[in-house]
Structure formats: C-alpha cells, structure tokens
C-alpha cells in the first residue's frame, strides 16, 4: 500500500481469518506498542443479536487493569449511560479524546469512564460496515492527557476496515 502507516508486522495477522482470535490478540499488542498506549482493548459485537463483550485486552504492564469480559451480553443499554457507545451504535466517525477530565459531557460521560475504565485519554475507534457496528478498538493512556497525532488517526482509520474480516470471522466462530 502506498503511503500506508500500517507497520509491515501487521500484514500477516490481517491476512488470516482461519485463526482470528490469536491474530486479533497479537494485533492489539502491535497497536498498543505502535501508539505508545497503556492499554488497547477490542470490544466485539454481533449486530444481529446485539450481543457484545470486550473479547481481547492488551496491557503495557500488570499495573494496568485488564478489562476482558468472559460473557457475551446484550449491549443496547450501555448507550444510555455512555455517549461514546451511543456514537458507535450510530456508526459515527471514531472519536479521539485527549483528556477525559475536560471532555465535552455530550461526548464523554466522565464519571462512567473513570468508574468503568479509569483511563485519561482514549481513541474510541468504530469498526463498522454499512450502518452496523461490529466492534470498538480502544487504545488508551492512563496518567496524563494525550494529544492524538494525525499519524495516530491515520493508522487507526487505515486499520479499522482491515480488522472487519477478522472480527466477523471471530464472531462467526464464537457465536455461530
């Protein structure tokens, strides 16, 4: 790809759908390292059943909370308390939050973010197809605000459509 910001190490993982679980897990680590994030998780959902869960989570070290969820659950009610999730369900463009503590309350529920995730800055990257939400990639940092650079944004936006086949394959294998 010309002008691609995706590192070459991403390509073999993005090219497989036979083993989507391990590929997605490994990709989170690569994304986390590339963006110098503290944590990177992947929320997956089946848009037909509206069942979702945080299926994968990479943490820079053991001091960072791992938020992986074991059970799939209906996710529509999350949108009532989380405007970021509501935006994802609408398939709005991805949202880059530089500081949760001063973000617009119409965009970020600061109390919900602090209580549920504890991060300070995040990317809420929506994996969509048409008007359907298939997942959310969420790199974040904890102790300080973070200005997300144009190169960070380009990497995320280039990666999202490439993740979709893996996400769909994982959901098919896991939920049928």
PLM regions: where:
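Signal-transmission linkers at sensory-effector interfaces
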Residues: 1-25, 33, 54, 169-176
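GAF sensory/regulatory domain recognition
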Residues: 41-76
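Sensory-domain boundary capping and coupling elements
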Residues: 85, 127-142
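Soluble sensory domains of the PAS superfamily and closely related sensory modules
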Residues: 86-95, 102-105
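Signal-transducing coupling segments at domain and membrane junctions
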Residues: 98-121
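A short, aliphatic-rich beta-strand micro-motif
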Residues: 120-128
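Regulatory loop-to-helix N-cap segments in sensory/regulatory domains
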Residues: 141-159, 167-175
């Amino acid at each position: 790809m010309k002008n691609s910001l995706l590192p070459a190490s991403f390509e073999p993982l993005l090219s497989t759908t036979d083993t989507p679980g391990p590929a997605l897990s490994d990709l989170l680590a690569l994304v986390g390292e590339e963006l110098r994030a503290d944590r990177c998780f992947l929320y997956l959902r089946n848009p037909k059943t509206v069942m979702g869960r945080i299926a994968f989570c990479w943490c820079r070290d053991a001091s960072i909370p791992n938020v992986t969820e074991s059970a799939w659950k209906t996710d529509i009610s999350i949108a009532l308390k989380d405007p970021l999730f509501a935006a994802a369900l609408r398939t709005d463009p991805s949202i880059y939050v530089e500081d949760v503590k001063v973000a617009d309350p119409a965009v970020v529920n600061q109390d919900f973010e602090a209580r549920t995730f504890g991060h300070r800055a995040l990317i809420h990257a929506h994996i969509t197809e048409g008007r359907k939400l298939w997942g959310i990639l969420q790199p974040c940092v904890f102790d300080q605000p973070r200005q997300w650079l144009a190169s960070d944004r380009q990497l995320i936006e280039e990666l999202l459509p490439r993740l979709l086949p893996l996400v769909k394959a994982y959901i098919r294998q896991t939920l049928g």
